[in-house]
UniProtKB/Swiss-Prot annotation:
Coiled coil: none annotated. It holds the Pfam family Thiamine_BP. Belongs to the UPF0045 family. This is UPF0045 protein MJ1052. It comes from Methanocaldococcus jannaschii (strain ATCC 43067 / DSM 2661 / JAL-1 / JCM 10045 / NBRC 100440). InterPro entries: MTH1187/YkoF-like (IPR029756), Thiamine_BP (IPR002767), UPF0045_domain (IPR051614). PANTHER family: UPF0045 PROTEIN ECM15. NCBIfam families: MTH1187 family thiamine-binding protein.
Length: 100
C-alpha cells in the first residue's frame, strides 16, 4: 500500500521582550498556517500541523517572519514526524495512544 507522504509537525513561535502575554502574536502565526493547505490544531503550548512537508516549511517560515515583523526577537521551533511505513496523521497518532 502506498501512503500520501503527510508529515505531522509541532510548531512553537515565541516572541521575546513583549511582556507576559503573547496571544496576539500567536493568533497572527495561526492565521498564517490557516492560509495553507494544512490541518491546524492548536493547544496550550504550541500548534500541530499536518500536511505536505514543503507546505509546512513554507508556512513555518512565513509565520516566523510575520511575528518577527512586530517584535525584535523570536525563538521558533519545529519538530517534524515523517514516516514511510504507514499513514501519518494527527488522528492516527491520537488513536494509537487512546486519546481519540
Amino acid at each position: 500500500m502506498i501512503f500520501m507522504r503527510k508529515v505531522v509537525a509541532e510548531v512553537s513561535i515565541i516572541p521575546l521582550g513583549k511582556g507576559a502575554s503573547v496571544s496576539k502574536y500567536v493568533k497572527k502565526a495561526i492565521e498564517v498556517f490557516k492560509k495553507y493547505d494544512l490541518k491546524v490544531e492548536t493547544n496550550a503550548m504550541g500548534t500541530v500541523l499536518e500536511g505536505d512537508l514543503d507546505e509546512i516549511l513554507k508556512a513555518f517560515k512565513e509565520a516566523h517572519s510575520t511575528v518577527l515583523n512586530d517584535v525584535d526577537r523570536v525563538v521558533s521551533s519545529l519538530k517534524i514526524d515523517e514516516r514511510k511505513d504507514k499513514e501519518n496523521t494527527i488522528e492516527r497518532k491520537l488513536k494509537a495512544i487512546g486519546e481519540l
